[in-house]
């Protein structure tokens, strides 16, 4: 964003309120990855369109902080004369506060938009320099955003047990029985969608309704949601299991818990600090704990697992048709990032089962592929050129499962450098796919396997290797991940991505991604530990033109041949004619 009039108006509003500065996070009141248009405050002020970031604006300075996924994108979208663009690890917001605020300064924040943990960290940083962190419930951006969109109004639907695998009544009973408090406040819409077996359309790509809930150890749950969005069948579904209230009633209900001196559990990593403040001020005994839905939601039941398999076969057919089309059209020229992304979306739509995409397709041609979470726009849209690589990361929401797949494709003849880097990324992906590991193993213990071949050549990538994936829910789901620091044990039923990458700035990007399901593995002869492993769900050919066979071991080549044989069998049975002929060639054994 090069128009700085919004920044000037925002500073004028801060001065009017006698604030030194203000924190602007990407999050909304529900801390999800995707937000409704009304909550795109960070984008409106700065121009940054990524899914994670935080800005701090004072009367004289401004900075925006992003992680490694967005270091290139933020410089392209934000006026770097007006905003410092900083890496959150190298220069976190708290350190910036300590450097730039002084004694007596007041730093404002919206307590619905920062979690309890985040507010504590910012408060500690302010205290260090004698400044004060001040909650402001009337967001100053909302005061100057004259054309701010309204709140979402789309209808809510039920998620039938034929897809959910368990009734909402059973889930809520289990949650109440496992509670170590009188009540627990749920603030994450995907947790609420899972536990109540409902789905919504309030944010892009993730089928959730924006809502809060209070679970009680004794008595019905309370669900705080816009009742106008609930058709009669959904109200009938909820009536036996919940008291439905309007969103504005959350504060009175929290205060009622306080008057009872109830012990109330919140997750400080996701609950807005405002909720904690209301509870404490009202007299509740607040206890911190993880969202009680996180682990049971992540451990898919047998119905959800089978749904994921069916969804990935369906998605594999769409991907095969897309890759066949791409191989025919790319040599002719005329393709652009947007036209390719649109074609893939059309092929998924043609399945007749698509509910939505699971995220905004990342379609990066040449240098744009070097930005791991590049978001193509009409302004940035680039043609696909001969001699470049094209990275496409996409996914779908089907009622029986969520998909996420990345493939890197050559446009013309790849260079030796491209083939070397691609093969090293492939080796990492195969290493994760093949590993068997003992119960209790965390993603951080496996992460090195994906990076080892790149490390041997002095390379790495600045993102995690894998994230959890929901069941017709968020494509990025906790609590388990595969990265350098995660400490959550992997358990059967969890679905994660397996996506190592390599990025050469201003040149090209490479990523290969499959989804995998954690399952109990066969015992190892002579071993005494119960072992787990991964079942690969994604069914999509990996481009052999980018593979340097001399870098693959016999075991790696065998894995890839077996994988392609499975793709051909499960996807090929649903293709015919030229598309099937193409798939047979794409899945042929390596020479």
Task: Describe each region flagged by the PLM.
Residues 1-591:
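Active-site neighborhoods and metal-handling regions in enzymes and metal-associated proteins
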């Amino acid at each position: 964003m090069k128009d700085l009039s919004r920044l000037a108006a925002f500073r004028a509003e801060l001065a009017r309120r006698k604030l030194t500065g203000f924190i602007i996070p990407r999050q909304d009141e529900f801390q999800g990855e995707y937000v409704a248009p009304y909550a795109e405050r960070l984008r409106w002020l700065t121009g940054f369109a990524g899914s994670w970031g935080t800005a701090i604006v004072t009367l004289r300075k401004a900075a925006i902080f992003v992680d490694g996924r967005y270091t290139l994108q933020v410089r392209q979208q934000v006026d770097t004369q007006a905003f410092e663009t900083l890496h959150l690890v190298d220069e976190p917001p708290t350190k910036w506060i300590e450097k730039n605020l002084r004694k007596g300064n007041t730093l404002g924040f919206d307590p619905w938009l920062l979690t309890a943990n985040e507010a504590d960290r910012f408060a500690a940083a302010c205290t260090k320099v004698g400044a004060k962190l001040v909650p402001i419930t009337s967001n100053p951006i909302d005061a100057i955003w004259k054309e701010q969109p309204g709140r979402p109004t789309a209808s809510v639907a039920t998620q039938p047990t034929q897809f959910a695998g368990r009734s909402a009544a059973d889930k809520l009973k289990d949650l109440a029985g496992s509670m170590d408090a009188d009540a627990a406040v749920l603030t994450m819409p995907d947790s609420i969608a899972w536990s109540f077996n409902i789905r919504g359309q309030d944010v892009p790509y993730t089928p959730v309704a924006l809502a809060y809930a209070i679970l009680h150890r004794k008595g019905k749950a309370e669900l705080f949601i816009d009742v106008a969005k609930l058709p009669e069948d959904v109200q009938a579904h909820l009536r036996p299991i919940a008291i439905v209230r309007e969103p504005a009633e959350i504060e009175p209900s929290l205060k009622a818990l306080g008057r009872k001196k109830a012990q109330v559990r919140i997750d400080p990593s996701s609950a807005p600090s405002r909720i904690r403040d209301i509870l404490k001020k009202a007299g509740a005994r607040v206890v911190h704990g993880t969202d009680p839905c996180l682990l049971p939601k992540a451990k898919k039941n047998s119905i959800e697992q089978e749904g994921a398999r069916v969804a990935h076969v369906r998605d594999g057919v769409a991907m095969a048709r897309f890759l066949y089309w791409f191989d025919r059209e790319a040599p002719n020229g005329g393709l652009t990032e947007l036209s390719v992304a649109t074609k893939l979306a059309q092929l998924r739509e043609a399945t007749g089962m698509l509910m939505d995409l699971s995220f905004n397709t990342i379609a990066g041609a040449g240098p744009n592929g070097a930005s791991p979470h590049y978001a193509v726009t009409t302004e940035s849209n680039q043609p696909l050129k001969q001699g470049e690589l094209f990275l496409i990361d996409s996914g779908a929401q089907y009622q029986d499962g969520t998909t996420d797949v990345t493939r890197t494709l050559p446009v013309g003849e790849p260079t030796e450098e491209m083939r070397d880097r691609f093969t090293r990324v492939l080796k990492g992906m195969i290493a994760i796919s093949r590993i068997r590991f003992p119960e209790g193993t965390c993603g951080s213990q496996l992460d090195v396997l994906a990076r080892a071949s790149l490390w041997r050549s002095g390379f790495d990538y600045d993102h995690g290797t894998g994230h959890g994936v929901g069941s017709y829910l968020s494509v990025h789901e906790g609590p388990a991940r595969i990265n350098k620091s995660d400490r959550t044990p992997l358990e059967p039923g969890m679905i994660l991505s397996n996506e190592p990458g390599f990025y050469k700035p201003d040149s090209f990007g490479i990523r290969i991604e499959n989804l995998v399901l954690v399952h109990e593995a066969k015992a190892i002869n002579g071993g005494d530990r119960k072992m787990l492993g991964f079942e690969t769900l994604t069914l999509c050919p990996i481009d052999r033109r980018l593979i340097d066979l001399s870098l693959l071991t016999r075991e790696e080549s065998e894995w890839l041949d077996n994988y392609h044989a499975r793709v051909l069998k499960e996807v090929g049975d649903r293709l015919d004619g030229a598309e099937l002929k193409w798939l047979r060639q794409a899945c042929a054994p390596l020479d």
